[in-house]
């Protein structure tokens, strides 16, 4: 079973320099100038259920692991098993809220100000408040409500399957099924 582990340095790091999207920034550099402590300590860990990848073929499983993002005292992960984004307190590991998505969430949300934005296999992009997970807005990001059978359930013909990126006041994402 996947285990989400947060070290003490992540809590201190999050206060100084957040990790607001997958691989840190719009360039997907996965790098920061933040210094690591000499001796990190385990702060908390959580058992999370295994995700449900979009494809059974292992080499196609782009979504087989949790991808956390951090802002302030919130750590967020998307879940393709539970069709939601889950927020945890970075100090205690306590679950703070769940924002339901009406479809699998396969990629990390992007944190923009006091909100988190994410897409799901239902073809929608949703914005929720970081404080409580309540919906600020939801937009159908695709041209129609057409559905197909995917992972033993109905999903959009154009699921939102690209981790969103925020840059210069805009959010970018991708929709569609691949490989064809």
Predicted regions and their residues:
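Generic low-complexity segments that are intrinsically disordered, proline-rich and/or Lys/Arg-biased
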Residues: 3, 38-41, 110, 165
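Sec-dependent N-terminal signal peptides
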Residues: 3-13
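Residue-level detector of intrinsically disordered, flexible termini
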Residues: 11-16, 115
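Repeat-blade elements of multi-bladed beta-propeller folds
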Residues: 19-23, 59-85, 102-126, 153-180
């Amino acid at each position: 079973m996947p285990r989400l582990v947060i070290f003490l340095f992540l809590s201190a790091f999050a206060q100084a320099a957040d990790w607001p999207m997958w691989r840190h920034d719009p360039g997907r550099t996965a790098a920061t100038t933040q210094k690591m402590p000499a001796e990190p300590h385990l702060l908390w860990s959580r058992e999370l259920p295994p995700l449900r990848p979009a494809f059974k073929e292992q080499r196609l499983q782009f979504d087989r692991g949790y991808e956390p993002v951090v802002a302030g005292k919130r750590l967020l992960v998307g879940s393709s098993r539970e069709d939601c984004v889950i927020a945890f307190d970075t100090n205690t590991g306590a679950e703070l809220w769940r924002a339901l998505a009406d479809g699998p969430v396969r990629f990390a949300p992007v944190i923009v100000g006091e909100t988190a934005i994410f897409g799901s296999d239902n073809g929608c992009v949703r914005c929720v408040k970081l404080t409580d997970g309540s919906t600020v807005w939801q937009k159908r990001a695709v041209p129609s409500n057409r559905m197909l059978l995917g992972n033993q359930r109905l999903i959009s013909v154009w699921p939102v399957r690209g981790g969103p990126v925020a840059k210069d006041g805009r959010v970018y994402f991708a929709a569609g099924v691949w490989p064809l």
